[in-house]
Amino acid sequence: MSGHTVLVLYGSQTGTAQDTAERIGRQAQRRRLRVKVEALDTYNVVNLISESLVVFVCATTGQGDPPDNMKKFWRFLFRKSLPADSLSRLDCAVLGLGDSSYPKFNFVAKKLHKRLLQLGANMLLPVGLADDQHDLGPDGVIDPWLLSFWQKTLSLYPPPAGLAPLREEDKLPPRYIFHFLSEVPNKLTEHLQTVDNKSSPTPLRPFPAPLVFNQRVTHTAHFQDVRHIEFDITGSNIEFSAGDTVMMRPCNTSEDVEQLCQLLKLDPESYFTLTPTDSSTEVPARLPQPCSIRFLLEHFLDISAVPRRSFFELLATFATDELEQEKLLEFSSAAGQDTLHSYCNRPRRTALEVLTDFPHTTAELSIGRLLDLFPEIQPRSFSIASSLLEHPNRIQILLAVVKYKTMLVKPRKGLCSSWLASLDPSKGDVYVPLWVKKGSLKFPQDPESPVIMVGPGTGVAPFRSAIQERVAQGKMANVLFFGCRSESKDFYCGSEWQEKVQAGQMILVTAFSRDQEDKVYVQHRVKEQGKLLWDLIAKKNAFFYIAGNAKQMPTSVCDALKAVFQKEGGMSENQAQEMLDGMEKNGRFQSETWS
């Protein structure tokens, strides 16, 4: 092993950047370099001045924001007091993961690259801008970028003479060693850690909130099962405002856990402790020590996700069957990504299903590889759909249950939505560990500022929270555009809106797309209400918000709004765009969309 160390630091929101960082780490090991892979916020940033070689891998979230696990690092790096030559000894490179269908494409990676240059760092390569929209997905950029990175790096930091790189099919050592206990420990509290009564819940110390209400709000004849779910947060110290989100981690189904135990011949009731094989690696903070196999598989490892390319790379190193090895190596290669997409991504085949498709290779897997093979279950976020001012000690959400068919026989289900929908408080106490995170939507403090909200479908959730909060504060200038398929089937919170309209607390404009021959969407209603909107925006300094599915709706609503500016304000197309850009810059136009 070389005396040179490559440090791979990542900022990841959904786990993709972390997976890429770990893949770079394995490539470094194969090239006989020492390596450490770490989240940016767990790394002691003051040590950066003494590092020699660092790769930064970062995603962009929301409106060009850094991921949660690099925010502390981000604030430190942009301190104005840092000297211009702080990082003059550092060789580094930045790889960004993004989606060019969003306006702030790879904004974090670009800004980080620029800041590192300002601080005197020697950039080994131009910033890598991986794109989900690329024909080959992010790997279409990542693969050639990494090829250039290793050529440059190995010329500066060559491995020791006589040490050849490890082949792709050679096994790397596991990250952790499992030590099984001969006896079951007494009285273990694996599931819920107690929350300090004086502090707010965090990802590592979530609040076990009783789920007290779970009811379908769509008509039984409607294709989509949408739930109104309520949690009791009494005694949690949780505070939140309109626009904030509630976070939680789902559990795997007992059926999937049992199936994996059978495949790998594991006893779910056995207990173990973990020791890292590298002294610089720590045991995952969310795993209790000792821990049961059942807890590991049910609460920690993401066994039902669609596996990434790295899953197949690792699996290929265990293949003894020639046909299975050939297929796994193809899936691991740059040339095989189309085939992998057809096999795995398009039909949404899960990691568990892949293991059953490769029985000989699966039989070679040992338990020590579980934490290398499967990523950790990532937290899910939901817009809070209620206000503490109207519902004290409660958090409410609107949950669309994800279920769909692909070419596979078994229907695909969303892990978190299916898990939450299955929880029934009428059959006994149900607890969901959760915490709250600040959202990207900010509502005006000025009581005179009107608020215009466009929230079709479950996109209405943050606006229900905002309207409840604003009405409780005496702010009545609220306009809501709500869209759904049918007034009788999926008009969420319809009676609540009507009550508030009757009380003079809001204006409601609806678009029921399938209740007449011509489809009517929220963007059509925005155009129809042009005079009202122009008056509120141009004369009364109104704020405009969009929330919902990121397919065509946000763009269509923006186009409709610009058409209003042109018609009612007598503007040219360019002037309308400039007005919208100005509103966005001043925080008067905000959107929160998801795919």
UniProtKB/Swiss-Prot annotation:
Q: Name one GO cellular component term.
A: cytosol
Which InterPro entries does the UniProt record give? Answer: CysJ-like_FAD-binding (IPR003097), FAD-bd_FR_type (IPR017927), Flavdoxin-like (IPR001094), Flavodoxin/NO_synth (IPR008254), Flavoprot_Pyr_Nucl_cyt_Rdtase (IPR001709), Flavoprotein-like_sf (IPR029039), FNR_nucleotide-bd (IPR039261), NADPH_Cyt_P450_Rdtase_alpha (IPR023173)
Indicate which residues the UniProt annotation says bind FAD.
Answer: R348, R380, S381, F382, S383, G414, L415, C416, S417, W594
The cofactor required is:
FAD; FMN
Q: Where is the signal peptide?
A: none
Q: What is its EC number?
A: 1.18.1.-
Q: Say yes or no: keyword Flavoprotein present.
A: yes
Q: Which Pfam families match?
A: FAD_binding_1 (PF00667), Flavodoxin_1 (PF00258), NAD_binding_1 (PF00175)
Please list the reactions this protein catalyses.
2 oxidized [2Fe-2S]-[protein] + NADPH = 2 reduced [2Fe-2S]-[protein] + NADP(+) + H(+)
- From the Swiss-Prot or TrEMBL record, state where the protein is found: Cytoplasm, Perinuclear region
Q: What does the entry list as the binding residues for NADP(+)?
A: T458, S513, R514, K519, V520, Y521, V522, Q523
Report the GO molecular function annotations.
electron transfer activity; flavin adenine dinucleotide binding; FMN binding; NADP binding; NADPH-hemoprotein reductase activity; NADPH-iron-sulfur [2Fe-2S] protein oxidoreductase activity; oxidoreductase activity; oxidoreductase activity, acting on NAD(P)H, heme protein as acceptor
Q: Which keywords does this chain's UniProt record carry? A: Cytoplasm, FAD, Flavoprotein, FMN, NADP, Oxidoreductase
Sorted alphabetically, the Gene Ontology BP terms of this entry are: iron-sulfur cluster assembly
Could you tell me the superkingdom of the organism this chain comes from?
A: Eukaryota
Which of this chain's residues are annotated to bind FMN?
12-17, 59-62, 97-106, 132
Record-stated family: Belongs to the NADPH-dependent diflavin oxidoreductase NDOR1 family.
Quote the function comment for this protein. NADPH-dependent reductase which is a central component of the cytosolic iron-sulfur (Fe-S) protein assembly (CIA) machinery. Transfers electrons from NADPH via its FAD and FMN prosthetic groups to the [2Fe-2S] cluster of ciapin1, another key component of the CIA machinery. In turn, this reduced cluster provides electrons for assembly of cytosolic iron-sulfur cluster proteins. It can also reduce the [2Fe-2S] cluster of cisd1 and activate this protein implicated in Fe/S cluster repair.
Assembly and binders: Interacts with ciapin1; as part of the cytosolic iron-sulfur (Fe-S) protein assembly (CIA) machinery.
State the name under which the record lists this protein.
NADPH-dependent diflavin oxidoreductase 1
- Source organism (scientific name): Danio rerio (Zebrafish)
UniProt lists the gene as ndor1
